[in-house]
Structure formats: C-alpha cells, structure tokens
Amino acid sequence: MPAPCNCIETNVCICDTGCSGEGCRCGDACKCSGADCKCSGCKVVCKCSGSCACEGGCTGPSTCKCAPGCSCK
C-alpha cells in the first residue's frame, strides 16, 4: 500500500488533510500551494525579483504573478 502522499504511485495528489508528510513523492503531477502542505518538497515556490511580493494564484513559475513592475524568477 503506497503512502497517501506518494502521488507518483497513487496518481492522486494529496497535500493537506490525509497526508501526514510521510512517504512524500510528488513529481511534476503533484504540486501544492496551500500553507497546510505537509510535504515540503511539493510546495510551489513563487520567487519575484528583489523585495517584490508574490500575488495570489501562483501555481508555479509559469503562473507566477509578481507585484507590478517586478519580474518572476
């Protein structure tokens, strides 16, 4: 029985409730953006240049929205 957080084996992306943080394997198919993401390696990180803040709706580099006049990395 694969761990509930192992989305490579289960093909189901569970990040928050139901995932204890054990046996995390996310892969490209499973990325979490919520603060309650138990698997640190699954967390989507949006980085903006300098001290610019990230705006909501960021699910990865391609959808990263930074404050106006800022660029995403």
From Swiss-Prot:
Xref: InterPro entries: Metalthion_mollusc
The UniProt record lists the keyword Metal-binding: yes
Annotated protein name in UniProt: Metallothionein 10-IV
Residues binding Cd(2+) 6: 54, 66, 70, 72
Subunit structure: Monomer.
Binding-site positions, Cd(2+) 5: 48, 52, 54, 58
GO molecular function: metal ion binding
UniProt binding sites for Cd(2+) 2: 19, 24, 39, 42
Keywords in alphabetical order: Cadmium, Metal-binding, Metal-thiolate cluster
Record family assignment: Belongs to the metallothionein superfamily. Type 2 family.
Chain positions recorded as Cd(2+) 3 binding sites: 26, 30, 32, 42
Residues at which Cd(2+) 1 binds: 15, 19, 32, 37
Binding-site residues, Cd(2+) 4: 46, 58, 64, 72
Induction: By cadmium.
Function comment: The metallothioneins are involved in the cellular sequestration of toxic metal ions.
